[in-house]
């Protein structure tokens, strides 16, 4: 099965998405540049157009704001930070082309991206070949920090194994062991469903499911099949606009009365876009804005919200924030922007709480370069007393180490340049 996703997008839709990214003018890449000489150049590749655009826009918003704050405090190692944002258009070939452009023409010091796991995986091949420091803020497929891990690549979001491990036992305990999966047929969905099936089978469960194109919009045939199967739980593993459409049709078919709903991720960008009846189910959040026991979270939320239209930041804003500060911390520890020295500095580095914005110990694990971050398991619900973004109740927090298992079990064997 191919990771390549070919989508075409009307120019009007492209400009609408572009305008959402902080009102930046689009002339080639989006560029955020501080005054000063010899800037540190960071290339940021994300699918600003296509079915995952809402998630990408949040990541770019988070990156834009973080860079602005960094530059107000002197940049990195005294040099201003220049952010160059390119649209992968949710297409692997386009993403790879943009990576080559950023590295070979724009001479960036590091690369970040992509939301789409297949593109993130392909970018890793380019950055490894070119020996460029690379952080994946939000692409989840396991091989990135698993069997195909690279010395230069780190990941901030969870693996699919971590998300599946965190929520599977909760779904089985509350609802039952007969599941139906609706899953996107590309790198992310393939590894996610495999991990869910592994955990469910270990608990004595049974399942059926369909794997569909990431850009699917009509789920009627699959939902009819799911209804006939009569599962205890339907897992909607789609993402972006596809997940939104699936949720809407799930409610229209009245299936919310017949079975429980859940899965790995129902991100706030998507929860905002479905009717109240579909704002439901048990899921994981990779970060959430309401953490009363972590005062640094409130400080972050209060600071960034005015820059993103008064909304609460989502996990996607957090992923960019953490990734950029991780790069800063690595450069400061290494006292260099050399890719090898930065990678050596970040491996095993524990993030301070003002960067991690989490209650537990958070670090990029040395054995596989995967961020060990807390995972929030709970219920999505319609807006609560906390306002329009009060959409999730955390029922438990699973540590990254508990969800991920040992690094040597991932298949990662990092080979450093000689």
Residue ranges and their predicted role:
Residues 2-5, 9, 14-17, 26-30, ...:
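Extracytosolic ligand-binding ectodomains
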């Amino acid at each position: 099965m191919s990771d390549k996703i070919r989508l075409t997008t009307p120019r009007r839709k492209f400009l609408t998405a572009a305008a959402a990214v902080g009102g930046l003018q689009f002339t080639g890449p989006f560029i955020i540049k501080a005054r000063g000489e010899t800037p540190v150049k960071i290339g940021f590749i994300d699918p600003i157009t296509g079915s995952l655009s809402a998630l990408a826009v949040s990541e770019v918003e988070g990156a834009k704001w973080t860079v602005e704050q960094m530059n107000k405090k002197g940049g990195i190692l005294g040099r201003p930070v220049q952010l160059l944002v390119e649209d992968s258009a949710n297409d692997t070939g386009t993403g790879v082309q943009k990576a080559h452009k950023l590295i070979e023409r724009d001479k960036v010091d590091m690369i970040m991206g992509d939301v789409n796991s297949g593109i993130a995986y392909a970018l890793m091949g380019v950055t490894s070949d070119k020996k460029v420091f690379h952080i994946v803020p939000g692409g989840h497929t396991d091989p990135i920090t698993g069997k195909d891990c690279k010395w230069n690549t780190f990941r901030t979001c969870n693996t699919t194994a971590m998300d599946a491990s965190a929520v599977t036992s909760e779904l089985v305990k509350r609802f039952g062991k007969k599941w139906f999966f609706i899953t996107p047929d590309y790198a992310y969905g393939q590894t996610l469903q495999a991990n869910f099936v592994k955990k469910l089978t270990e608990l004595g469960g049974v399942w059926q499911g369909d794997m569909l194109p990431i850009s699917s919009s009509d789920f009627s045939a699959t939902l009819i099949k799911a209804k006939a199967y009569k599962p205890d739980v339907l897992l909607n593993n789609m993402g972006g606009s596809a997940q939104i459409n699936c949720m809407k049709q799930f409610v229209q078919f009245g299936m919310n009365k017949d079975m429980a709903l859940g899965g790995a991720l129902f991100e706030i960008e998507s929860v905002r876009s479905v009717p109240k009846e579909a704002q439901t189910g048990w899921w994981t959040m990779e970060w959430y804005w309401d953490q009363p026991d972590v005062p640094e979270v409130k400080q972050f939320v209060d600071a960034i919200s005015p820059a993103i239209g008064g909304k609460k930041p989502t996990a996607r804003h957090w992923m960019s924030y953490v990734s950029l500060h991780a790069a800063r911390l690595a450069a400061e520890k290494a006292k260099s922007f050399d890719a090898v020295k930065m990678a050596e500095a970040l491996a095993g580095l524990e993030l301070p709480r003002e960067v991690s914005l989490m209650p537990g110990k958070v670090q990029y694990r040395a054995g596989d370069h995967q961020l060990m971050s807390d995972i929030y398991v709970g219920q999505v619900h319609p807006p609560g007393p906390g306002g329009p973004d009060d959409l999730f109740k955390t029922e438990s927090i699973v540590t990254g180490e508990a969800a991920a298992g040992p690094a040597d079990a991932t298949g990662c064997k990092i080979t450093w340049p000689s």
